[in-house]
């Protein structure tokens, strides 16, 4: 059973996050291992396994990039374990330049420039994210997979920039 079915939700990217949260709580109550403490060893093991599956499904569906990757996996694109990389050389060059810029910001300890950089990367991420949503809605799986690969780069860059921000603020 796929994670969307487990949560009683349609297999699409855009979800009702409130329904997801409520269903998670219901499933957790229903399959909590403590409810099966007096059951047989097989029942206890099944409850632990079901609880682990529910937790994994919850983690996957509540995080946008993980949800997109999972949805794509249901359509034959296993992005989590693939060796396929981004082949868009212009995008890769842009990423290298952004990484170099982030390194320069770190060396200069330039908080104002870092703030501007973070905003710019967030805007780039948001633009690509919107494109991915449209591609997934239109079932353009190949294009969506390529966009998700690019979003991973941007997500890592954003995370690195935010970590640098924390580091600079701690000085």
Curated annotation (Swiss-Prot):
Entry keywords, A to Z: Chaperone
SMART domains reported in the protein's UniProt record: DnaJ
Pfam families: HSCB_C (PF07743)
GO cellular component assignments: iron-sulfur cluster transfer complex
GO biological-process terms attached to the record: [2Fe-2S] cluster assembly; protein complex oligomerization; protein folding
Keyword DNA repair part of the UniProt annotation: no
GO molecular function: ATPase activator activity; protein-folding chaperone binding
Start and end residues of each J domain: 2-74
Keyword check for Chaperone: yes
Source taxon at top rank: Bacteria
Family: Belongs to the HscB family.
Assembly, per entry: Interacts with HscA and stimulates its ATPase activity. Interacts with IscU.
Described function: Co-chaperone involved in the maturation of iron-sulfur cluster-containing proteins. Seems to help targeting proteins to be folded toward HscA.
Name this polypeptide is given: Co-chaperone protein HscB
Organism: Escherichia coli O139:H28 (strain E24377A / ETEC)
